[in-house]
Every structure is written in structure tokens, then in C-alpha cells.
Amino acid sequence: MWTLVGRGWGCARALAPRATGAALLVAPGPRSAPTLGAAPESWATDRLYSSAEFKEKLDMSRFPVENIRNFSIVAHVDHGKSTLADRLLELTGTIDKTKNNKQVLDKLQVERERGITVKAQTASLFYNCEGKQYLLNLIDTPGHVDFSYEVSRSLSACQGVLLVVDANEGIQAQTVANFFLAFEAQLSVIPVINKIDLKNADPERVENQIEKVFDIPSDECIKISAKLGTNVESVLQAIIERIPPPKVHRKNPLRALVFDSTFDQYRGVIANVALFDGVVSKGDKIVSAHTQKTYEVNEVGVLNPNEQPTHKLYAGQVGYLIAGMKDVTEAQIGDTLCLHKQPVEPLPGFKSAKPMVFAGMYPLDQSEYNNLKSAIEKLTLNDSSVTVHRDSSLALGAGWRLGFLGLLHMEVFNQRLEQEYNASVILTTPTVPYKAVLSSSKLIKEHREKEITIINPAQFPDKSKVTEYLEPVVLGTIITPDEYTGKIMMLCEARRAVQKNMIFIDQNRVMLKYLFPLNEIVVDFYDSLKSLSSGYASFDYEDAGYQTAELVKMDILLNGNTVEELVTVVHKDKAHSIGKAICERLKDSLPRQLFEIAIQAAIGSKIIARETVKAYRKNVLAKCYGGDITRKMKLLKRQAEGKKKLRKIGNVEVPKDAFIKVLKTQSSK
């Protein structure tokens, strides 16, 4: 039985001499060397990838630095990054060409279901061009604003990017953000106009937009259809011609940058590394510049797109490294690895991911606490940008306060908990991290600093003990067709945004820049923007620090008792409308009692909104058939006194499902 192994595609000149040769045949057997038919002997030495039967180690020394290209694919969400990555993998023979090749690099179930990339993935492509063997290291990056941290991290290991733009939709907000990330990192940018096969595609209009917004000549744009594979070969040519090889030194001591890491329960941490200097091989003793811990390298290799062990990794190459690290915190993102007893100057790392949204997470049933704790620990090993603090609530029990990069990040994390660990949770309304400048010497002594960050609204300090409150702000970019500009400007003003800039990209499209309080966009701004613009507007934001704000802590009271789970921090101007809405939702969710329930929203001692749940009424006059009116009055008076007493001593127990209903509605609103 013989197995036919497909060969990688090269460019036309490289393919020509091979067209008449026989196909490469591989005899079965335990790790036997490939045998050839009539094909030239040199073919065997050109074999650079392995089938499932052959896990022989690759010799990476065959690729000199000048034949290496490290690049990322960046784009707005749904502009075809992952589809282009699939075609590049097929063209270079990394994967077989089949109809099932959709989102090959997107390995998470949530990524495939939502059709988005959440975690950046790496693949090493081997490509023959003009008789030379090239090593192309591809990093497929996410497109959604919440995961821009993944993009900036991936770019640190690259020398160039493919900036993919949809020929139908044109430049969108995330396209602009990704371009400037690449521009600031001084990377070569190759604009690729995708989806030219669509009926409404207008590549010439998109070329003009790219020239106007990014100052890239229109003749540098490559027009392709990643879905059909049209003109994708020219993208590979452009990568070789326009992206420079990495500037590295193989004779210097090892310097490797950890730009990502994942956790495997059997092998420990798998660190994705980019080598800037030196060589690393199995058995080497390496030291982390961050923790100063020493490890022994168990395995090195490249991702092709699955793990492919190699003898060594050389400077300029991107691959993975397993060294017995038991915790992802040991493989700190941005850390520098060097050889033991050969210390080097650490590489400039990254800014650590800063959580923008916080939410409480509790198990549906407290008996599931330990299982959920284990699931969160395992998931955070693969997602170091999530912060975890223990928390507890009278109504919901023990839980955690989690920090996320954005609302989609929170939804994806929750979905992964359900799918991968079968865990059901209650998520409280998301909040943002506020700051308070303290004036109380007692509080300053307690916190050991004058400026504190508040991630839990229940811990918001009183106004009398604070000089000023600060709220996080972001610089938002909105790109929209011009007919929706007026409506969108009104929406932004209603969200307390300040306009910073307005540019016409072409005759029909406008780019607006606004400074937003983060709290105003974190829950439902994106949905409102999409509905106002019939789905055509796109939105992206970047951190812009903090600004002074008139913030107040709003308590929700049930018969005068504070419900801690529903405490919120709001802007003074919006306190009444938000308080009224929460009271109305709580009224609809609470079961009636034998006594009246007063639901109140309060700022300090001032009540700003109220709703009442009427009591069940028992007819105490049913047994009276006529008779003196004073008898009836006496019975009614006794009933009123009993209800008054019951109201004082009767605790209003808020059922868990009522909490879930209020919190979910608040999030969806």
C-alpha cells in the first residue's frame, strides 16, 4: 500500500522543472525514510513538512535569516483574515486542499460558532520561490476591539503585516486601529483588498480610501478573493519582496521573547517564542528574566499549524518551547528567556493587559463552587488577561470579581465556561474601574495610598471622605455612511461624549472621533450604534486615561434595607432615570408578600425613585354578617397593626431567579 503525499505550491518558475516528475510516494512502515519513484533525488532533501505517519524533526538551520519573513494578518472583524490564512496554508502545502478548510487556525468552539478569532494563532509556512526555500511565519490575529491586546502582542514578533480590507465595506474602525498599531511598531504594511468576487465590490473606491486615510499609494494594493483563491499567490510574492527579514544575530547569546502561551494539562505551559538572538535546543537550561527561575527545555518546534518538533530554533524564527513550567504566570507575556549563566539585556516587553470591565461571577448552586473554581483556574491559565478576585454576596453566596478587556471578552469567557467545562453561572451587571482621591487620613492609612481604584461598587467611598472621583475615558472612532451622521452625533452627546474630530473618508463615508466615558459604552452603545445606522457603522476605541466626574453611589433599598448586589455607581445626571428603571424591573421580578414592599433607589439619605409591591389582601370582614360598624372597624384596625408589625420584622427575601432576571435585563439594556 502506497500513500500519495501532496507537495507545496511554489511560484510558477519554481514549479516548472517539477511538472513532469512523478508524485512523491511514501512507503508505510515505522518511521522509514521516504522512497522515491522516478522523481529526482533532491526532492527527498526538499521535504520540509511531515505527514501523520512521519513526525521526523525538521532541520531549521536550512533557513538563513535572509529567507525568513515574519508577518501578521490584521483586519476589521469579518473582513476575511482567517479565510486568507486558510488559502495561504493550502498554497504552501501546509494543509491539504479540501472543502472543509474553514477557520483552520481558529481552534476554539466559540471561535467557530461565532465566526470570529479570539486567540492569535501561529503557523510556519514553507515556500519555494525562484529556487529558494523561504520560511514564512504567519500569525492570524483577532479583529474585534476587545482583543486588540492580542494584536499588539503578535505584532511584536513580526516585521510586516497584511492589512486586509473588505472590497464591499471598505475601511472600518478596527482597520484604522490596526494600521496605527502596525505603523507605531514601524512594520511594513501590505494592503490587501479582499472579497473582489462580491456583487457589490468596489475595489477602486477602497483603493482611494486607503490612499487618503493611510497615505499608501493605490498601486501597492493587492486585489484578491480569499474565498475563491483568486490572486492569492501574489500575496505570497509581496510578503517575500516587501517585508524585510528580521534583524537578528545567531552568534550572540540566546534572547527569546515570549509573546503568547497556552496550558496543556499533561505537558505544562507551551510558550510561543520569537527568537531575536542565538539558538535554543532540547536540553538547554534557560532562565526567565522576569522570575529568574531556571528551566530545562524538553521540546522545541514550530507550529505547522499543529506542533512539529525540531532539533533547534534559530534567531529570526517563531516557534514554541516546552520547559516544564507548571503555571502560565511563569511564562509571563513579554518576558525574555536566555541561557543559564549567559545573562542578556531583556527585550522591551508589552504593557500588561488592563481590564476595562468588571463583573461578579457566582455559581447557580453553591454546591458547584469547587467545580466552577477549578474551571475558572484552568481557563485563566490560557487567558492571562482575565483578573480574578474572590468575592461574596449575601444573596448569591461565594463567588469572584472578574476583570475583562471588554463586553465581548466577558461573553466569550462565559461561553467557554459553559462549553468546555459545562459550568452554569450568574454574571452581575458589568462595571468599570473608577478611582477616588481620598481626603480622609483614616482611609489613606487603611489603603496606604491617596488614590484608590474601585472595582466593586459596594466599596465606593463616601463623598465626605473624597476630594474627587475619576472615571475611565476612551477615544472612540466611528466610521459611518454620512446619512446617519446626525443620529450618531445625537447618540454620542446623550452618552456624555465630547467630539474631537470629523473627517470625510470619501463622498459617502465619515470618520468621527469622540472622547467617551467608558461606563457609557460598556453595556449597550455598540447595539444602539448598529440599530441607528442599519448595521453600517463600525466602532473601535482605545484607552485614554481618566477624567474628573460627578459620580454617586446609588443604593437599592427593600423596606429600608440595602441590597448589596444591586448597588451601582452612576453619573449624577443619570441617577434618577437609572434608579427608576432598576426599581421598575425589581417590582416585576419580586413575588408579593403578606405585607407591602417599598422598593427605593437612594443616594445617601435622599430617595430618588420608588416603586411599591402591593400586599396580598385577606378579607377579615368575611365572617361579619351585618352588625355594628365598630366591630368591622376594630377588625380592620387589628389587621393594619399586624401588617405594620410584620413589615418591621419580616425580611424581604429576594429569590435568586429574581436577581438573575434583574441582572440579565440590566446587562441587556
Curated annotation (Swiss-Prot):
UniProt superkingdom: Eukaryota
Annotated CDD domains: EF4_II, EF4_III, LepA, lepA_C
Transmembrane spans: none
EC number of this enzyme: 3.6.5.-
GO molecular function: GTP binding; GTPase activity; mitochondrial ribosome binding
Transit peptide stretch: 1-49
Catalytic class of the enzyme: hydrolase
Domain tr-type G: 66-247
HAMAP family tied to this protein: LepA
Homology family: Belongs to the TRAFAC class translation factor GTPase superfamily. Classic translation factor GTPase family. LepA subfamily.
Protein name per UniProt: Translation factor GUF1, mitochondrial
Protein's organism: Homo sapiens
Lineage per the UniProt record: Eukaryota, Metazoa, Chordata, Craniata, Vertebrata
